Curated annotation (Swiss-Prot):
Pfam families: Aa_trans (PF01490). Keywords: Amino-acid transport, Glycoprotein, Ion transport, Membrane, Sodium, Sodium transport, Transmembrane, Transmembrane helix, Transport. This is Putative sodium-coupled neutral amino acid transporter 11. One of its GO terms (cellular component) is membrane. GO terms for molecular function: L-amino acid transmembrane transporter activity. The gene is SLC38A11. Its main location: membrane. The lineage of its organism: Eukaryota, Metazoa, Chordata, Craniata, Vertebrata. The chain crosses the membrane at residues 38-58, 65-85, 105-125, 150-170, 178-198, 225-245, 256-276, 298-320, 336-356, 358-378, 397-417. It comes from Bos taurus (Bovine).
Amino acid sequence: MGYPGQRPVIPPQSHRDDRETLVSEHKHKGKTCRQSAAVFNVVNSIIGSGIIGLPYSMKQAGFPLGILLLFWVSYVTDFSLILLIKGAALSGTDTYQSLVNRTFGFPGYLLLSVLQFLYPFIAMISYNIITGDTLSKVFQRIPGVDPENLLIGRHLIIVLSTVVFTLPLSLYRDIAKLGKISLISTVLTTLILGIVVARGVSLGPHIPKTEDAWIFAKPNAVQAVGVMSFAFICHHNCFLVYGSLEEPTVAKWSHIIHVSTLISVFISILFATCGYLTFTGYTQGDLFENYCRNDDLVTFGRFCYGVTVILTYPIECFVTREVIANVFFGGNLSSVCHIIVTVVIITVATLVSLLIDCLGIVLELNGVLCAAPLIFIIPSACYLKLSEEPRTHSDKIMSCVMLPIGAVVMAVGFVMAVTSPQDCSHGQEMFYCSPDNFSLTNISISHFQLTTQLSILNVSIFQ
């Protein structure tokens, strides 16, 4: 793992333009990764558990407004990720925490440390929830397996996946080693996207649309921004990825972020659109909860997504561990402490995830309480205080816009999430999966076969 001593120190830029190249003052002792690996790490961090809730955010905001908000959140994410590195250049720091400490002192440092720990920690909890929900349904489709068997229950699956997969992967000390794993995760996400699109075409026409399906805007738009922020945020680990680059520069980082954001927004828009258009007002926080259990194609998608979040989990654990290392151990962990801290973090996250089974509220609260300040407020505040650019500079204007919007999203979103919680139908089959609904009883068959059967049924009725 790239702890502060293993990353390049970003030199102060007080006498240089903040767009200039950042050059390391000493040889980078940690392992480095190529730009392509960095892109996959960033995309994998963005396209984590949050993407599964994007169709749900369309339901909350209203589909037309939801699409516009998703583009806006992606632009703000791109801008603020680059802004953070510019702020680091101005302050001569090499971590998010040291940047805020240099800018706002110890109180700011503590606040950021709490947020930077809570966001990935809650993300780890959501990953466990998704793993338990998705893989339990996968195992239920195995011939001869009793769906009520405790050995395929979500709780045991969460524990086993943690012990066998996520814990060993999280024990790595160097994030660059996860580049190939992130590539695998990105490929699996593409397969999942294809399945959601295919089911949008074959399944969507047979599910009744809700009355408010096409309303432009809905009252829960602020909560929707929270879910989108949860999906797009990767600010908590951007310094880890930046520090793993060979000869990191602002220009190189900007290119990586632009490419990563474009890939992520394309996948996100397509996923959100197809998912929402299929189920409209019935869309759940976990999109896979909407599909019928006897759909074998979606079962394969559940398996792919379960693997994806398992592979994404270690990146979030890296960040939580680094926060603890910086706050309590001066930025360096011995081998023994490294193992102990990792095991404690993962154990607590696992225990919490065993007690919670509704993903929607987790995405909302993490989005408005942690993601919003990390994306909108803190990068803008740091840059505004550090930069000596004129007030009319584009970066300063955008920062002035982002800061108050982030505060509104954080405050209003939290109040609405607590006072107006959304329904959660966890573990229940949706009404359209009933055997009485002929068009969906054999969902795993092709769209052509489904259409043919419906036509035959209509003919027999008229006869």
